[in-house]
């Protein structure tokens, strides 16, 4: 989902954020290295953008939609607001915000989430994710989640 990552980078930059991408080409980057990159950058948040799929034998008509995963408890608030924005922007089934022992987030110390915008095993969701409109919606959802999360940390007057 590099296209979504690039669009999110542009949206965040326009909003005044400093963005460090752990991957800018289709070549894979080791999951542990992604955490190291985020720590070295002193990132305030880490978001890993994905599309979900299931192994053989899992019913895709039961398991489909958007999902946000976290490893560390301090990531729950970011996950919850991002998941809500994903549902609003993409309009897919809510698979929740859930703990999972995800390698990409274990080595981070900032709020870290992994988003699964849709399921590529579902032909309609896969086709939609290939369109610029839905890619923009996915990026916008993550932007909204980050904005909501950081706004919640601001001191009240």
Predicted regions and their residues:
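Active-site-proximal helix/loop segments of hydrolytic enzymes
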Residues: 2-157
């Amino acid at each position: 989902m590099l296209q979504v990552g690039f669009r999110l980078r542009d949206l965040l930059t326009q909003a005044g954020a400093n963005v460090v991408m752990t991957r800018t080409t289709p070549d894979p980057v080791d999951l542990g290295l992604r955490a190291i990159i985020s720590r070295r950058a002193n990132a305030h948040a880490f978001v890993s953008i994905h599309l979900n799929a299931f192994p053989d034998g899992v019913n895709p008509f039961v398991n489909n939609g958007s999902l946000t995963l976290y490893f560390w408890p301090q990531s729950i608030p970011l996950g919850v607001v991002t998941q809500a924005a994903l549902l609003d922007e993409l309009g897919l089934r809510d698979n929740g915000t859930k703990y999972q022992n995800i390698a990409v987030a274990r080595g981070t110390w900032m709020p870290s989430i992994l988003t699964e915008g849709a399921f590529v095993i579902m032909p309609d969701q896969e086709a939609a994710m290939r369109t610029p409109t839905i890619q923009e919606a996915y990026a916008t959802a993550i932007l909204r989640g980050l904005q909501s999360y950081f706004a919640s940390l601001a001191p009240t007057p």
